[in-house]
Amino acid sequence: NMELTLALKNNIGEINRLHSFIEEVGEVFALPMKTVMNLNLVLEEAVTNVIMYAYPKEEHEYIHLTAKEQDGKLIFILTDSGKAFDPTQAPDADITLSADDRQIGGLGIFLIRKIMNEVKYERIDGKNVLTLEKEL
């Protein structure tokens, strides 16, 4: 059972490494280009949320991402040891507002829910664990 993992520093500069990882996931699981693009959007949003909300500015910690296929679903598990932050509790974006007036994070979870089939947040052993599933 194939499983790919990535460790990112909690730094926005790491987003390029995230994109490379998603492309690798796309190749390994033979995903259509559109799916890869959507996954890039979703994971960038999820990782950015962690960087912005879960960690104090100067704390150097890692964010771990695992991708695997199970029962016809692609599953991403994003884990960090930052402060508790449940992105699924962020209000959905008010899409009638201009981008500047929207709350940070709101559009993100709206987008994530739209693209992924299942989104689940848990706090386990002092860690944030976000599980994102997409049916293949």
What is the role of each PLM region?
Residues 101-116:
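Glycine-rich phosphate-binding loop
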Residues 22-44, 101-103:
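Conserved short strand/loop->alpha-helix "switch" segment adjacent to the catalytic nucleotide/phosphoryl-transfer site
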Residues 68-76:
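Short beta-strand-loop-beta element adjacent to the nucleotide/active-site pocket used for signaling
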Residues 60-68:
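A conserved short beta-strand within the histidine kinase catalytic ATPase domain
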Residues 3-33:
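Helix-loop-beta hinge of the Bergerat
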Residues 1-7, 12, 113-136:
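Flexible, glycine-/charge-rich segments associated with ATP-binding catalytic modules
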Residues 50-55:
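Short helix-loop "hinge" at the ATP-lid/N-box region of the Bergerat-fold HATPase_c
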Residues 76-104:
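Glycine-rich/acidic phosphate-handling loop/turn and adjacent ATP-lid/helix
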